[in-house]
Amino acid sequence: MSAAALKTITKKYGNILVNGAQVFEDLKNMKVIPVSPSLDYALGGGFREGTWIQMIGDPKSGKTTTALQFAATCQKKEYGERPIFYINVEARLSTKNFEGIEGLQADKITVVQAEEEPLSAEQYLGAVEKLVKSHPNCVVIIDSISSLIAQKDLDEEVRGDYRPGVPKILSNFCKKMSSVVPKQKAIIIMVTHFIANTAGMGKKKVADGGVKVRYQADTILEIAWTQAWKEKNEGRQIGQVMHWKIVTSALGGFVGGEAIGWLRYGLGIDKKQELFEQANDFDLISSAGAWYTCDFLVENPELISGPLKENNIDLEDKEKITKFVKFQGQQKLREFLDENKLWDILENSLAEMLS
């Protein structure tokens, strides 16, 4: 392209011509924020700023909890203390959503919701547009896009004999905001429901919201199924296990793979349980029946030199060290890792192995 042509384009449209190397460098400099140990591994690191995330699943499957847990991480100083906006479309936000998420600062979340009269899809998405444009590095959780309703539908009587207009509105919203989100380094999380596939072909359930939303999303996660998480002894349900399918990831990751998330009631995503499961899978913690051995400590006894010294165990005595870090049941193992503040060390050991 000639210099004259470049000058003409720049004069007419502004500085829209950018060197490819600069674009590549800008993408590399985008921060990646962790979600949970299991999802981070499957996604290739977590969620990258400047991207769109779609979380799809059945009701009560853990989508909102996961989104709010991510918000809690984004509130931390090391991740920029980002502004959090929760778009409460479903109007079902409850105290348990706030109290049941470890580390979540409710006083630092701005909730957008209807007062007396319901808000239309156009109004909600218009508010999101203004918030993203005026708040760099923000995180917006739209919960859910499946519950949005067009102004036209709000103004008319309830009917079921025509196609609703929300997919078109969402399509226009995505087009309008596609270049704004990366420029503002924002993260938009679109919580989405599964709906019945009435086409009669293919999957029984499909994601609500239209095709354009899926085209726009940089990362798409589906909760394929869930199961009850119960205590082994008492049989009391303490949470649920989420089986995530990685449809696509902005960071590459394992597309088509599965990530198993552990949601503990009253806590949110149980990151320690996920670390334990990963460590067990990759033999940093071995198991034999109900017994668990911290092999990563057997191989690196200097990490627990203090406790070993207190128990008169020599750093070279591998047999005694193995007995010292062997526990009957997960609970005793967790207590040991808690008491000796070893979770970060375990996480770093996993990161080194998987990098």
Regions from the PLM with identified roles:
Residues 69, 74, 78-163, 167-172, ...:
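Conserved inter-motif catalytic segment of the P-loop NTP-binding fold
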Residues 153, 196-200, 288-291, 321:
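N-terminal cationic and glycine-rich segments that engage phosphates or anionic surfaces
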Residues 163-282:
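Phosphate-binding/switch region of NTP-binding enzymes
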Residues 4, 34, 38, 50, ...:
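Charged, alpha-helix-enriched surfaces in structured cytosolic catalytic cores
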Residues 52-57, 157-164, 200-203, 257-265, ...:
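Short hinge/gating elements
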Residues 1-22, 228-355:
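C-terminal regions of RecA-like/P-loop NTPase motor modules
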Residues 2-108, 126, 133:
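The Walker A/P-loop phosphate-binding site
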Residues 12, 16, 42-46, 58, ...:
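Conserved, well-folded catalytic cores of nucleic-acid-processing
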